[in-house]
Amino acid sequence: MTRKIKLTRANKSILLNGLAPYYYQEKALGHNTENPGRLILKINALPADKKATFSTEEIRLMRITINRLRNERLGKGQYTDAADDLLLKLF
């Protein structure tokens, strides 16, 4: 199943900030990084403010990484408004 999601410039930035540490962590642990790598390239290639189609697996991966980023920022006492907005789009 796929869903169309509109990504703003801020959404793209937050997604890439969340996916990059996940990618490097998985790579350091020796796990398969094909799916996160492909998703990073897909998001980076998208024009801002356009709808894009994402698979269920891609959406799950985005939710996990954005939630990790949000929790990390909450722990540091930083704002999480952009991450919260994106999480709402992904549910």
Task: List the model feature ranges, each with a label.
Residues 1-91:
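Positively charged, low-complexity terminal tracts
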